[in-house]
Amino acid sequence: MTKIAIIEDDAVISQMYRMKFEAEGYEVQMAANGRLGVELVGKMRPDIILLDLRMPEMDGAEALTQIRKKDWGKNIPVLILTNVGVEEAPKELENLNVLSYIVKADLTPRQVTEKVKEALAK
């Protein structure tokens, strides 16, 4: 079963995506901040990560930096799913092999699901 890690501090949003992906047959696990997200990815070894940028304790850019430092985290596809516009995105993301950058307000949950399917098909 394909595994998705959702690292998002907004419980309503993460739960909405969890239900959407589980209905599509994916295994989904969630973390509410970057620190917990790094731990989750280390244990879970997901096939893809949906990552918010602005979170408490550790933001998404720092979490992804930590994930990419690990052998197991170097090649996991990552979709940034955030309210931060691309022009405001942290510069360090440019060097962290982000597959796609999605502004939450720009896409419906169905469209995000399609983006994940496309990414997994590559």
Where would I find each of the regions flagged by the language model?
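Conserved acidic carboxylate
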Residues: 8
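Helix N-cap/capping motif at the beta->alpha junctions
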Residues: 30-39, 60
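Active-site beta3 strand of CheY-like receiver
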Residues: 44-50
